[in-house]
Amino acid sequence: MKIAVYPGSFDPITNGHLEILKRALNIFDKVIMLVAVNPNKKSRFSAEERVAMIKEAVNDERVVVDSYQGLTVEYAKKHGASHLIRGLRAVTDFEYEFSLASANDFIDSSVDTVFLMSKAEKSFINSSMIMELYQSGVDVSALVPASVLKRLK
């Protein structure tokens, strides 16, 4: 069984994240969506809320949702995952993601990173932008799943 970990803050999860997940499921038998917990980063939603939003948005037995504080590559190894999934919205994401993948490879070269490009129509979507638009009164219902929308209201 090919298992991948798709880590992220998912604060909140967006339709862009879900599009990357859908494509990852075409490659892997199981994907673990891993909510990253970073005590040094202020989150809009708690880890528990983010896990709940993802579980409500994703109805697929091939997807497991979990949260973790620590090195993602170590989590992947512990849970039998051979790959990490990273979504790229634009070329500007690549430099940071490449550095992260290189660091993960240094820690454990048995876990590879797979980069999936966002579809052009979803490349502008990110969690911070969603929150800014929502707080400005813009309807974001086309950009986030219903599980997020109900928590924004």
Name what the model sees in each region:
Residues M1-K153:
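Nucleotidyltransferase catalytic core that binds NTPs
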